[in-house]
Design a protein with these regions (language model features):
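An aromatic-rich alpha-helical recognition segment common to small helix-rich domains
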Residues: 43, 107, 118, 132, ...
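Short loop/turn hinge sites at secondary-structure boundaries
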Residues: 19, 23, 151-152
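Short, cationic Gly/His-enriched loop motifs
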Residues: 2-3, 10, 15-17, 24-115, ...
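Extended, polar beta-sheet/loop recognition surfaces of beta-rich domains
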Residues: 89, 149-178
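Generic "edge-of-domain/loop-turn" microfeature
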Residues: 89, 114, 125-127, 137
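Short, structured coil/loop segments at alpha-helix boundaries
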Residues: 2-3, 21, 110, 157-166
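A short, exposed loop/beta-hairpin motif centered on an aromatic-Gly-Thr core
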Residues: 31-35, 125-135
Length: 178
């Protein structure tokens, strides 16, 4: 029987150092693991002391290890910046760069309408936020909607997540360059 910490450790190492993984998920090619986290007994002990480590979401899924909620864009798995969060929170920060091309986050060009459309994922469903003449207009609508949604989800999980996660999410700002 594999321990949860063992799976987490192996997945973390694979994400940072596997060339095969990087071919499928190139954003991880610049990620690394702190020296302490490379030492399994240390990582195991650290996990067992963290808020959310033994928690489950409302579907019975274990909370996930996250490296970049506390510091946007963080590329290092380390004890200072990693936290355990429910999948719903982890999915809030997923960016779909390949699908949107050169447009701002949350914005796509609709060829048939000849307008920009703002869209946002909410609980795994796409919410259409309207058509706009400029990508900037569409982005502002997306930004306001997304920041409000992040706060809503943060409040839902407030009593079950690390206070640092709650504060980071409540202060999160969507940037046009995300």
């Amino acid at each position: 029987v594999r321990l949860k910490e063992d799976e987490l450790s192996k997945n973390m190492i694979k994400r940072c150092y596997s060339k095969n993984f990087h071919e499928k998920f190139p954003t991880y090619s610049s990620c690394s693991v702190s020296e302490n986290f490379k030492y399994y007994p240390y990582f195991k002990e650290w996990c067992n002391k963290q808020a959310g480590y033994t928690s489950q979401d409302d579907k019975g899924n274990a909370f996930q290890l996250d490296k970049d909620i506390l510091v946007k864009g963080n590329k290092v798995y380390s004890e200072e910046l990693c936290v355990f969060v429910p999948k719903e929170i982890n999915m809030l920060m997923v960016k779909c760069g390949r699908k949107r091309g050169d447009n701002p986050i949350g914005v796509f060009y609709h060829n048939r309408e000849k307008k920009y459309v703002a869209k946002c994922k909410v609980r795994n469903k796409t919410v259409h936020l309207g058509y706009y003449f400029t990508s900037t207009e569409a982005f502002i609508v997306y930004k306001n909607f997304k920041e409000s949604y992040i706060k809503e989800v943060s409040n839902k999980w407030k009593d079950q997540i690390d206070v640092r996660v709650y504060e980071a999410l409540m202060n999160y700002h969507v940037e046009i360059t995300d």
